[in-house]
UniProtKB/Swiss-Prot annotation:
InterPro entries: Ribosomal_uS11, Ribosomal_uS11_bac-type, Ribosomal_uS11_sf
GO biological process terms, semicolon-separated: translation
GO cellular component, one term: ribosome
Protein name: Small ribosomal subunit protein uS11c
Length: 132
């Protein structure tokens, strides 16, 4: 028999905080996106380096990733919400470590950090050799 999951009110409406959640960091070479979800996967807040005001090549810097991580969890801290979180990182970008350091400094207790970067198992066939 399936267990019933109690419905949690949305933080966007300001009803209540989320005591435990998951912080997703997607770090590409061009941008860093930080999404905070509850345990069920419902997005609570998000931020990106581009949304924080960085434009062009400055979006791919570690400082922009740090700013994005701080903005994503600032709303949760203001609501008195998240006490414990898990970090799931994806991508090879330069801002992944800086974003996780910013989250660690915010006071949220981290249970674990997981890296789910997709790795090819031999990948696509390369293009044929160039003959000059």
């Amino acid at each position: 028999m399936p267990r019933l999951i109690k419905k949690v009110g949305s933080l966007r409406r300001g009803k209540r905080g989320v005591p435990k959640g998951v912080i997703h960091i997607q770090a590409s070479f061009n941008n860093t996106i930080v999404t905070v979800t509850d345990v069920r996967g419902q997005a609570v807040s998000w931020s990106s380096a581009g949304a924080c005001g960085s434009r062009g090549t400055k979006k791919s810097t570690p400082f922009a990733a740090q700013t994005a991580a701080e903005n994503a969890i600032r709303m949760l801290i203001d609501q008195g919400g998240m006490e414990q979180a898990e970090i799931i990182m994806k991508g090879p970008g330069p801002g992944r470590d800086t974003a996780s350091r910013a989250i660690r400094k915010s006071g949220v207790v981290l249970s674990f950090v997981r890296d789910i970067t997709p790795m090819p198992h031999n990948g696509c066939r390369p293009p044929k050799k160039r003959r000059v």
